[in-house]
């Protein structure tokens, strides 16, 4: 297999083309079926989280260890020299990358991962989320989960629900799935609609999409229902209660759904998916979170091995 991801920075999902996305999905499936504990032997990966994280950090660190590698790093950026002594991000990255083979980071500042890649001593930087900008490895695990449940990525009907304006996961996933000719349904309050630049990109590619204000309008057409949280703090109490009734998923909402429908969510869930939905055959968000390990194993293996 030709591996064009070897020694590559992974900053934005748009850094990867269709063939590279398919390669990560394939390798993730291979590693899920047949674990390989030697792919990161004698490799050290920095896990540097300047912002709180549970699933992303733990799944990355699990991925490194399952592949036979070693992890160093921190999960509280407030206790680093950068925070305590005024060290610049550029200096911090330059020093830490001199110790390791790859540098995984999360940072609250948009563009921090791209900046880090400029000072990484040529070591690959993997973006674990930079502010509201990009979260490419979430998109990779989403793609793997979609492929796992549908057997394909091409031509699917996918709805995004909730906070589409600020949600970095939906922006990246829409961009990635547009490479596979998917049809999109954007279900959100007007104040949290999908950003214009995403819609313009889809228009330029000839991708079909439509805007909706309730899940019930389209649930019977969908292959994938991608839920996100509508943040209460963005609305007054009366408006939020009205929004909540339209953008909370329960069993009744799923009446008429196709058998192959699967519900995804980047998590954490608050109250936008009723607990009762967990027990339906449509729920796939916990398996999706587990798939984060395999998608990140695949990415690390490809970035750190010329051939696998």
Curated annotation (Swiss-Prot):
Signal peptide as annotated in the record: none
UniProt: L-aspartate binding residues: 85, 168, 229
Annotated residues for binding of carbamoyl phosphate: 55-56, 106, 135, 138, 267-268
Coiled coil: none
EC main group: transferase
GO MF entries: amino acid binding; aspartate carbamoyltransferase activity
EC number: 2.1.3.2
Top-level taxon: Bacteria
Pfam family, one: OTCace_N
Reactions it catalyzes: carbamoyl phosphate + L-aspartate = N-carbamoyl-L-aspartate + phosphate + H(+)
Function description: Catalyzes the condensation of carbamoyl phosphate and aspartate to form carbamoyl aspartate and inorganic phosphate, the committed step in the de novo pyrimidine nucleotide biosynthesis pathway.
Family of the protein in this entry: Belongs to the aspartate/ornithine carbamoyltransferase superfamily. ATCase family.
UniProt-listed NCBIfam families: asp_carb_tr, PRK00856.1
The name this protein goes by in its record: Aspartate carbamoyltransferase catalytic subunit
Source species of the chain: Laribacter hongkongensis (strain HLHK9)
